Curated annotation (Swiss-Prot):
Expressed in liver, kidney and ovary. Residues 38-58 are annotated as: Disordered. This is Sterol 26-hydroxylase, mitochondrial. The gene is Cyp27a1. Interacts with HSP70; this interaction is required for initial targeting to mitochondria. Pfam families: p450 (PF00067). Heme binds at C479. Its EC number is 1.14.15.15. Disulfide bonds: none annotated.
Amino acid sequence: MAVLSRMRLRWALLDTRVMGHGLCPQGARAKAAIPAALRDHESTEGPGTGQDRPRLRSLAELPGPGTLRFLFQLFLRGYVLHLHELQALNKAKYGPMWTTTFGTRTNVNLASAPLLEQVMRQEGKYPIRDSMEQWKEHRDHKGLSYGIFITQGQQWYHLRHSLNQRMLKPAEAALYTDALNEVISDFIARLDQVRTESASGDQVPDVAHLLYHLALEAICYILFEKRVGCLEPSIPEDTATFIRSVGLMFKNSVYVTFLPKWSRPLLPFWKRYMNNWDNIFSFGEKMIHQKVQEIEAQLQAAGPDGVQVSGYLHFLLTKELLSPQETVGTFPELILAGVDTTSNTLTWALYHLSKNPEIQEALHKEVTGVVPFGKVPQNKDFAHMPLLKAVIKETLRLYPVVPTNSRIITEKETEINGFLFPKNTQFVLCHYVVSRDPSVFPEPESFQPHRWLRKREDDNSGIQHPFGSVPFGYGVRSCLGRRIAELEMQLLLSRLIQKYEVVLSPGMGEVKSVSRIVLVPSKKVSLRFLQRQ
């Protein structure tokens, strides 16, 4: 009782917020000038020893575009929204390791699986990544604590250790199966309504938009045990505002990242960016406060022994694992992460299944062989659906949700493939390019889920490198919600393929990807969902 009383007192003081804690030096070089150490990037051997060890090269010896050329690529050639394609362009010209400089920071870009492995295996106890300064500026301006995505060091470790509970392990994620299936049932009902209202009686004109609503409904139900009306014909205004604000925040973040600070009063992007973050946090705070009020009402009605700890936030609050300020700083970020992974990945998966009917038919056969039509899949069923898991893996290979990540090794100098980098060098991990490397994935541009299935011992076409595709990251800073995201995607995709044949709408054409921090379709994805007999 004393613990819960202290919790109520701390939440009463929530409105008193605390402040958060508190282009290349070398010109462009021809591909022929790529250092031999870079051309030999396939080697994963450690540093040499003895007198035969070659001289380690320095950061200044790396190739890369000059500052002006990099700016030209971003703004005049339009790569600011296609940074993943710019990675491929620069890798083709400079090799798997090159520098780019923007402002005062020089980044080292890594675009091969062995190079990613060399960096990620040197992370240490507290992996450091890009500081996301624009996110921090909003938190500082509003007096908000930093959330899980922008904290570093021991503070990050404390948050991550607390949030891991009831989230990270597969058995813990499986506890949310019934909640997810409830939301998915409502989603399918909403999808049926949308398709029957179309002119053809089976078309969904914007699949990503509908899946975004599903993902937001699901993550809010998991975090707060509350439905937010995303799947209703008329969405509540605060929920609709949140959905709009997330999309606009990501869109404007591209510009506020690359435009100089002196341009902020002159251009609209910064003001929009800040306002959208305000809306995101307003929604998150409302959800948190409602949960606190619900817990207090249960205490008054039944006493401390009569309150059953059930959901994720309820558990964290009762155990006092996070302070009120940490909760407000972190949970809006968790909502964002829970939405983008599932909605974008499922959109791409359905798009490619519609383009590959033979794969879709094989998947339908697998799903209905385990869960016949009319039955609802459960977590245990997916152990018998290897192709379903392979479809999701292949989709994430082609479209990693976040096409780049970064690491900064602060404790020591870092030796990578014959180069010695000083402490605090920022390494940009080019996941999009690495996962389309033909030396790791034959025919890398094609959608081939079967490449992930177990093969004969004499078949060499399988995965050749464990870091070839790491869409959820690696190590202690890997994706917190990976298990829940995978479960949600498996549950939904199996039920959709069980019930519908998915085909491209007439005139749909090819869909490319755009990078707005996360990788999204370049246009609306319109699909037909044909009822299976």
